[in-house]
Amino acid sequence: KGEDIDIVVGLRESGQLCVNLAMVRGGRHLGDRPLFPVNAGESTVAEAIAAFIRQHYAAHPAPARLIASPLPEEEEGSELGALLAELAGRQVPVVEARSVLHRAWAEMALQNARLAILARNQASAQQEQRLQALQQALELPDTIQRIECFDISHTQGEAAVASCVVYHGNGMKKADYRRFNMRDITPGDDYA
């Protein structure tokens, strides 16, 4: 079949909540997009799915049908249906997977959410190990909380710029990145 369907599944496992969006267009699976809501707190998986649907389809076109697992609560589901109809200009049914093909897509999306959680947890563990190795190499007595790295660059000795990247907690903190134009300095002479 040449269906246009999005499959939205949620999974809470190993201390992570993942909402995975699988997109099917013209009957072809185009891929998955796992998302990890930052403000989910103690939300249920169904609440996280409902919040994702609200936010995602406010900015992206809705397909002909939306499969959700688990389905949002009944009251929440009717509000979502009305919102999607308003945004799309047509009815967009939010249903559970019933046909064999739809169940297979939903199961694949759930498995991909599980793999995304596993990959995220492994990356976090590796990052923790690297941070401990750095702490030992620098002989720091306390756990590293924040690292700021600066790089000074220039173009043929002119237009010197300092760039700062920041690591905080468990990852890079791009909101704290900075660039500084440097004035009134002796130009560099390393033309390598």
Regions found by a protein language model. Give the residues of each.
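Conserved catalytic/ligand-binding micro-motifs in nucleotide and anionic cofactor chemistry
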Residues: 1-192
